[in-house]
């Protein structure tokens, strides 16, 4: 969407002190795609698990401390409807700005691709694309993020890579994607 492009452009500018990723705690698994999409972007981040009250009312137990420990970034269980909790939110945010932490794509790689044969194949494709990218850099984005976006056929990233990457590397990436998808014609 247009809003996503504006948000992504601002984040990639590197001007933000902190990015707060707000997810729906009552539908945590479905909501974490936003966090997964942020892995590979070198920006300080804080995860806010909103609607904790709704999650708890549905009988869901969310261990905020365990999530924070696993991700290595500040995590706050929160309910935006409970206005008395806003000082706690702001305190956590200020602390996250003073001690900035980025998501570590290396330590989270297994969670990103999951397990099993399909996950191994996806990880192999991403690794091969990363190698083909060579020393290519794009703002605050790591190569794993760029590789994932190329695999997803993200139009913006495909366009940037097409414009900036040498012809031989573009061909190498297209060959990787074509061989894995059994298709012809490339994305770049």
PLM ranges: what are they?
Residues 1, 13, 26, 31, ...:
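Generic serine detector
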Residues 2-76:
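Conserved C-terminal guanine-recognition region of P-loop GTPase G domains, centered on the G4
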Residues 3-6, 15, 30-34, 59, ...:
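Helical mechanochemical/support elements of P-loop NTPase systems and associated helical scaffolds
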Residues 38, 78, 89-90, 136, ...:
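Phenylalanine-focused residue identity feature
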Residues 46, 76-79, 146, 187:
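Structured core elements
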Residues 53-114:
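Canonical P-loop GTPase G-domain recognition
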Residues 72, 96-99, 104-188:
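Extended helical scaffolds that flank P-loop GTPase cores
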């Amino acid at each position: 969407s247009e809003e996503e492009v504006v948000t992504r452009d601002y984040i990639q500018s590197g001007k933000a002190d902190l990015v707060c990723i707000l997810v729906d705690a009552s539908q945590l698994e479905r909501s974490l795609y936003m966090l997964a999409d942020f892995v590979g972007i070198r920006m300080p981040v804080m995860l806010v698990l909103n609607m904790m009250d709704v999650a708890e009312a549905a009988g869901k137990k969310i261990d905020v401390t365990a999530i924070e420990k696993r991700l290595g970034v500040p995590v706050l269980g929160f309910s935006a409807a409970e206005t008395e909790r806003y000082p706690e939110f702001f305190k956590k945010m200020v602390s996250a700005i003073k001690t900035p932490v980025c998501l570590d794509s290396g330590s989270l790689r297994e969670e990103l691709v999951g397990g099993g044969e399909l996950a191994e194949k996806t990880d192999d494709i991403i690794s091969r694309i990363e190698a083909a990218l060579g020393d290519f850099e794009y703002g605050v984005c790591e190569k794993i993020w760029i590789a994932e976006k190329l695999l997803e056929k993200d139009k913006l990233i495909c366009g940037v890579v097409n414009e900036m990457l040498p012809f031989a590397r573009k061909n190498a990436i297209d060959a990787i994607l074509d061989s894995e998808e059994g298709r012809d014609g490339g994305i770049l």
